[in-house]
Structures are given as structure tokens and as C-alpha cells.
Amino acid sequence: MTTSTTSRLAIGASCVLIFGATALAQTSPSPAPAAAPPAPKFEPTATITTPGYPGVGPADSKLRIVNLPGGKKLHLLPATLDTTQWGWFDNAQAPVLRVNSGDTIALETMMHSHNQVVPGTTIEQIKKTRTDFPGRGPHTLTGPIYIEEAQPGDVLKVTLNKIVPRAYATNFNVPGLFGQFPTLYADGQVKYLYLDLDKMTTEFLPGVVIPLKPFPGTLAVARKEPGRYSSVPPGEFAGNMDIRDFVVGTSLYVPVHVPGALLWTGDSHAGQGNGEVNLTALETAYREFNITVEVIKGKPLDFPRIETKKSWISMGFDQDLNKAWTQTKAQTVKLLAELRGVSAEQAEKLMPSVSDCRVSQVVNVKKGIHCLNPKNARDREDLERPTRETPKYLVSHAKDADLNKAMNDASMGMIKMLEADKKVARLDAYGLASVAMDCRVGAISDAEKNVHCVMPKSIWVKQ
């Protein structure tokens, strides 16, 4: 298969409020993923290497800059083999772009595996891109981008201004590998979907229409540890968070670990369910991903946060969903104490009544939970946690002392419900749950942890 080298994406930004400054140690630290086996060092060059045009010569960075009002700059960053890496983060990687705090970047992203997962690629070929490169992630990452003022201990704010996806997306489960239930799905399938960017919908199945909600699955700064690491697990550097609320108009705040921060993005999504259970979302690439970067000094942060118009999003990650919850709870308590000006003990008591917590994903080695926390004390998030079908939702509820098992039971319950009640084929039900199901964390105690997975009935439309 030939590898396409073009894919378009741009990023833009808007301003948001700043957070409190007190840092809190991570409550449930996870062991850092082991470095990948040694591989040939990728040495990027500034030479354009588009097939058919060898030796064009070094790129001129000045030709990638557009001046904006107020003395700011817009940087244009195309996705080529020279401006992307496949599957690795490495803080020794030479920057492909250098910008200043306050600058805006309009960049492109590629589909998985350097644009190899495109309409026509079979599930067997997709599986081969994973099995032939053990330890390597599937994501093609545009970057790294060096932000001149950023130093360890600073915070990098990245605001999403605009997202323009390609005209298509894919959803697939790799046979017998990855996903929430790899042993139950030894068979796999790939679906290619048309994205109607006028209506902002895609038809997943005949009569099943999914609203599009584009967001970057992966946005990362460099880790503090040297070496080459898979792009799959998220962490304190952000990375493969797969938080579907991270959309245009929101901002990521992430601690800086190395000079220049080194910013990457990829794993571009047109939409996703909370859980992403079959491994993939509506996987696409961006013709334009428009962002603005800002370095914040003197306000240390120990873990990423996301700011929306009305909420702050806290998060946690671990291979064990119970520990991911413990970390998310600690980050949420810290955030609520800052927002409301109360003690940690008071914030912990407040959390169940104001924080809307969801299972972000369970397929990225480190599973994720995130909580939406209203900025205004009078506001409330969506705390609906149904245990049976409602006029609005199909519902699958499970409880167990182990949050991993509760999540497994609730999500599989929804998949079986789609098969039995909606007559959706087995692999299609797995995929539909991955792109449209919303798994919510309910009441939590040592003895019992509740997960409520809901599916909006509104996605079934009359033919």
C-alpha cells in the first residue's frame, strides 16, 4: 500500500479563565509505561519528500507564517512525512515548527498509520499495521511544535478555535486484539462512513444517524522522561485522553515538562461514545485544526484540566478503572475546593451533588474517567443516572465492588440490548456502542460502584 502524505488540519483559539494555583500530588500514581523496544532513530529533516517530487529542497519556515492583527502570527503546518511521527512520543524529536506564546497554528492531521487507514483498506491490512510494529501506537501525530517561552513548571494553555474534518471517517475493531472485549470479538470489521459536514451527521447504519462532535483524541506535550513511548496511554502530559467534551471553544491546560513544551496532535475524531469500547471512535483526519497556544507562568498545575464555557473538566487515568476513579476524585476535589473556596473535606462532600463523571475510554492501556464541574455554584451538570429505559434513552445499568466489572457488565448489557431489541448485527452493535453510548459513573462506595450506560433514542430516524 502506498502512503499518502497529504492531510489537512487547522487549529484556532479563544480565551478562557485561569485556575487556582495550588498543586496536589497525584493520589493514585500509575507506573509509567515501559519505554518501547529500541527502534531505528527517526531523524527528521526540513526537506520536502512528497513522492514524485524528490529533492525539492529545504522548507522555508517564513513561508508558513501569516501576519494577524495586533502583531500576532498564524502558522500554517501541513501534515507530511517530515512533520509527523507514527505511533511514538519522543522528547528528543526535532521540532517541526517554532512559535511564540499567543500565536495561532492552522495545521493538518493524517489518518492512522501515516494515512494507510483510508476507504478501501481492509480489516486484515489494518491489523497488520499493528502486529507488524509491536509497541507502536496507531496514531500519526503532527508535531512536535516548540513554544519558545515554555519551560518546565509552566502551564501550556491550548485553545481550540476551529476543526474541519475530512469527508469520511472509519470505525473498526481489530480481530482478537485491543478494545474492551478482545476475546469475545475474535472477528473484526471496518466501516467507512461519509461525514455530512453541512448537517454535521453521519449515517452509521441505515436509519441510525450519529451527530458529529469533532474533537482531538490526542493532544500532548512531551513527557519528562527521555526515550520513545507509545502514543496510546494518556498521562500527566495529556496525550490520548479521548475526552469527547474537548471540542471547539474549549481549552486544555497541561503542565510543561521540557523546554518548549513540544506539542503534538493526532487521533482526530468526528465523534465518540463515552467508553469507546470497540477501540475506535469516528476516526478521521482534519483538513484544518486551528489552535492558539499560551504559556502561563507562576500558576503550577500537576495534571491536565480542560475548560469549557460553563465547566472545568478534571480527569484521571490508570490501567485499573478503580484507581482511575481515585485519581479523578482527587483532582475533582482539588478543583472544587479552588472554585468554591472551601476545604478539601467540604469539596469531597459537595462532589456527588455537582460533578458529572463519565467513563472517557477503557481501551488506551490506561483507562480514563473525567468529571464536568460547573463554574457557577448555582449551575448543575447532567446528573441523570437512570437504571431502566426512559423516553429519551436505552439504558443498561450495572453495579459491583469492582468498577472495571461494573463497566464491563453495563457496556455489554447495552451491546446485547442493541442486538436483541434493535436487531443490530453483532459487530455493528459493538461499533455503535463505541461511537454513541454514554457510560456514566453513578454512586460510588467501597462496597458498590454503579455504571449507567445510556444510548440516545434520537439516533434512530424514520426512513
What label would you give each PLM region?
Residues 12-23:
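Bacterial N-terminal signal peptides
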